[in-house]
């Protein structure tokens, strides 16, 4: 949901650049919600239990299957468990109806759209749709899941983002750039 917050911010505010990590697709979350409901029918119950500190083996497996890569260890899932919380109903409604929002003109700025190759929530095939809205570069992190910052492959994601930021700074400082 963090990328949706960044996109909303950019509708009315300026920034030098943006990184959208595992973004909600322009079509909203309805498709992802339906896919999870059909492929992992116990997910919503298990996610709710995990957000209350009930870390059953089934709940942890389901959380891993949806949000993380297979390489993310059970100890890490339990450690991250204190950050699990129920989703905001208002946010869920807003993101479900995202496709119906009137889109304001977008400012021209460098944007990187990053997703995990193993993201079960928003698969990498959807990243180009978000990237097209921003004329952005796409980066797919091999074997990473949805939760890029906590996934076992977080260092690869962080390095890819850091490299992109360094290049964006160099381009902005180059003679003839739009900041001159």
Regions found by a protein language model. Name each.
Residues 1-8:
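Glycine-rich nucleophile elbow surrounding the catalytic serine of serine-hydrolase chemistry
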Residues 14, 133-134:
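Short, structured coil segments at secondary-structure junctions
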Residues 14-50, 91-95:
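Flexible "cap/lid" loop of the alpha/beta hydrolase fold
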Residues 54-92:
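Conserved alpha/beta-hydrolase catalytic His-Asp/Glu region
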Residues 100-106:
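The feature captures the conserved acid-bearing segment of alpha/beta-hydrolase catalytic domains
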Residues 107, 113-115, 119:
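Short beta-strand/loop motif that positions the catalytic acidic residue
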Residues 120-126:
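Conserved alpha/beta-hydrolase "acid-adjacent" motif
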Residues 135-180:
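Catalytic active-site module of serine/aspartate enzymes centered on a nucleophile-bearing elbow/loop
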